[in-house]
Amino acid sequence: MSLKISNFIDASNTKGPIRVEDTEHGPILIAQKFNLKDLFFRTLSTINAKINSQILNEQLKNYRLENQKSLLLFLNTLASEKSAESAFAAYEAAKNSIQHSFTGRDIKLMLNTAERFHGIGTAKNLERHLVFRCWGNRGITHLGHTSISIKNNLLQEPTHTYLSWYPGGNVTKDTEINYLFEKRSGYSVDTYKQDKLNMISEQTAERLDAGQEVRNLLNSKQDQNNNKKIFFPRANQKKDPYGYWGVSADKVYIPLSGDNKTKDGKISHNLFGLDETNMSKFICKKKADAFRQLANYKLISKSENCAGMALNVLKAGNSEIYFPLPDVKLVATPNDVYAYANKVRQRIESLNQSYNEIMKYIESDFDLSRLTQLRRSYLKSFNKINLIHTPKTFKPLSISLYKHPTENVSSEDFDAVINACHSYLVKSAPSNMTRVLNELKTEATDKKEEIIEKSIKIIDYYNSLKSPDLGTKLYIHDLLQINKLLLNNSHSNI
């Protein structure tokens, strides 16, 4: 029996060292509490880091072998389930702490790093999505960077919009101090490839080239005694096809609202997601302003540095509907905006998951006669709306008792469905929920943002119920179905 990542996740909830024990059925993980032996060797390790004693090294050797066995098994498992590159990145993130012991905290840190290495988010598998990229801030000597790209491969001519904000002009000794506070002209590069090249210094690139040269010599046995320091690349440092070093970013893939398709061709729809049109307009305008030298860059800024500009794009896409904007005090940083983008992603994914579960339940597991009875007060209007606006995906369930809708759909049809569903929810809910239910009631004339906010409230209300009855599930489903049609501008023909 081989171990899986899930076994390490289960073991990570303990505070003590995690070790491997071999059994006749295969290796198992043993989670222990810290004891005096662990404390003793941790202290020795700390002392030895300063004095580098050969005697202490021997004492620590066997103790560390126990940690290394657990660590190597974890890294091999991680490499097989994800990738060797992500396992390498995970090791880099935790290599200092695992010198003492291999703990649940180390597992969580390395799993999070491995997950971020290839990008997080279910939207990665979709043909339409937003990618937030972050090169993290590691202090004043490495400020980091952010960029945003919007991809749409569903169009006849696919689009890829990119924004990565930089200051114009060169920094000299005379302008170095003012560089932090003064406004300068701003501009955007057009590709992720350019960003990767920009994120590595000439000095680092030279060291990486020198290290590669030494390794090549040693591998060919032409120079066994070369005394140059071998400089190894990190997991996110790679050469491009032209021989230039670059640094990959941490990526967050965020869903866009509306119709979509998976990379294997499966049709999907996101009721919740960022607004592609608004964000694309913002990016195009900002780049046009930069071309006319009307756009600014300011490093110490809430909105005019790279992170602030990325935050502006998310805001244009209505991100604050899903999660409040971060409280930026003085300057927007890549790390803070990355954390915010990830929270937006998590909220959108959670809402879409709940929405899809509600849709799937009613549309696949239902009693036709019972649902027809529950819809009797608004069945005619419901069928008219659905048959006209979704003829290709419409199911027989909705057209029972009303097979020939010839009248035009009116706002009264939308109101009939909304009022009937809302009325049932109010009657079946506790009296203290009336205000909440009134806030989620959609009007056919509501703006797009209002419909999204009310759809979120519908989902949150549904998730707050412990055991909703069939009627509640159906009316929640129908309200969300109406909201979906309204968001698709179905009411523009009313």
UniProtKB/Swiss-Prot annotation:
Reported consequences of knocking out the gene: Decreased virulence in vitro, able to escape the vacuole, required at an early post-invasion stage. Bacteria no longer escape autophagy.
Cellular compartment(s): Secreted; Host vacuole
Name of the molecule in the record: N-epsilon-fatty acyltransferase IcsB
Annotated family: Belongs to the BopA/IcsB family.
Keyword Acyltransferase annotated: yes
Enzyme class: transferase
GO CC terms of this entry: extracellular region
Active-site residue numbers: H145, D195, C306
Region of interest called Involved in binding IpgA, as start-end residue ranges on this chain: 171-247
Free-text function comment from the UniProt entry: Virulence-associated N-epsilon-fatty acyltransferase that mediates lysine-stearoylation of host Rho GTPase proteins, thereby disrupting the host actin cytoskeleton. Required at the post-invasion stage of Shigella pathogenicity. Contributes to bacterial escape from autophagy.
Record annotation: effect of changing A94V: In plasmid pINV_F6_M1382
Quaternary structure, from the entry: Interacts with its chaperone IpgA.
Additional detail: The icsB gene can be read-through into the ipgA gene to create a translational fusion protein. The biological significance of this process is unclear.
Effect of R116S: In plasmid pINV_F6_M1382
Coarse class of the protein's main subcellular location: secreted
Superkingdom of origin: Bacteria
Outcome, altering R105K: In plasmid pINV_F6_M1382
EC number: 2.3.1.-
Catalytic activity field: L-lysyl-/S-(2E,6E,10E)-geranylgeranyl-L-cysteinyl-[protein] + octadecanoyl-CoA = N(6)-octadecanoyl-L-lysyl-/S-(2E,6E,10E)-geranylgeranyl-L-cysteinyl-[protein] + CoA + H(+)
GO molecular function per UniProt: acyltransferase activity
Result of changing S2I: In plasmid pCP301 and plasmid pINV_F6_M1382
